């Protein structure tokens, strides 16, 4: 048996090729799986469950069917932090806290989206703190739909522009934040996404940090079993 981890698909109506690739993944990669974990940024942007796009609603129906035979877990990312219970219920997904510990075939593991580890990005961490307040999210949800969409588009545009000017170091995780989370959770393994830099990092103390990749040019899935871990790339169908 095996457990699968994915993240940073950034699904949108503008990139239906990614949705197609994800559906193919759901068709071909879930055999003998114990569970599927989605580590945030399933969608490129999410302004509210009441504004879910048709392709997202169709995906929810697909995931709901799969959830009848396979548990699907979801952790919020920085792009879909407004995704709520209405959608997760429709998709059959179980929402997890942003930092969750679990036992993976005898290995204590902490899973998260990963944006909280990029502590050198001070501007983003300020925004992250603001949107962590339930009142701020509630206030945003009370705005008219058109206003919410406009704000989301503005934030997305500013983020893309800002990221182009940030250094490689600032955009990556801060080692001290990684060490602190290992110490806080007492786990031996960490799995996250967000940075779009898929890799397996082994530490001298026996700990392991695994980063799942994004789905912009190809798919990425981490397969964990009793035999170990396998970080796989999934080429998109050229057709």
Swiss-Prot record:
Binding site for Mn(2+) 2: 41, 78, 113, 194
Pfam families cross-referenced by the UniProt entry: Metallophos
Cofactor note: Binds 2 Mn(2+) ions per subunit in a binuclear metal center.
One Gene Ontology cellular component: extrinsic component of plasma membrane
GO biological process, one term: lipid A biosynthetic process
Bilayer topology term: Peripheral membrane protein
Main location: membrane
Cofactor: Mn(2+)
Catalytic function, reaction form: UDP-2-N,3-O-bis[(3R)-3-hydroxytetradecanoyl]-alpha-D-glucosamine + H2O = 2-N,3-O-bis[(3R)-3-hydroxytetradecanoyl]-alpha-D-glucosaminyl 1-phosphate + UMP + 2 H(+)
Residues bound to Mn(2+) 1: 8, 10, 41, 196
EC numbers: 3.6.1.54
Database matches in InterPro entries: Calcineurin-like_PHP_ApaH, LpxH-like, Metallo-depent_PP-like, UDP-diacylglucosamine_Hdrlase
Residues that coordinate or bind substrate: 78-79, 121, 159, 163, 166, 194
Signal peptide: none
EC class name: hydrolase
Molecular-function GO term, any one: manganese ion binding
Pathway(s) the chain acts in: Glycolipid biosynthesis; lipid IV(A) biosynthesis; lipid IV(A) from (3R)-3-hydroxytetradecanoyl-[acyl-carrier-protein] and UDP-N-acetyl-alpha-D-glucosamine: step 4/6
HAMAP family noted in UniProt: LpxH
Protein task: Hydrolyzes the pyrophosphate bond of UDP-2,3-diacylglucosamine to yield 2,3-diacylglucosamine 1-phosphate (lipid X) and UMP by catalyzing the attack of water at the alpha-P atom. Involved in the biosynthesis of lipid A, a phosphorylated glycolipid that anchors the lipopolysaccharide to the outer membrane of the cell.
Family from the record: Belongs to the LpxH family.
Protein name in UniProt: UDP-2,3-diacylglucosamine hydrolase
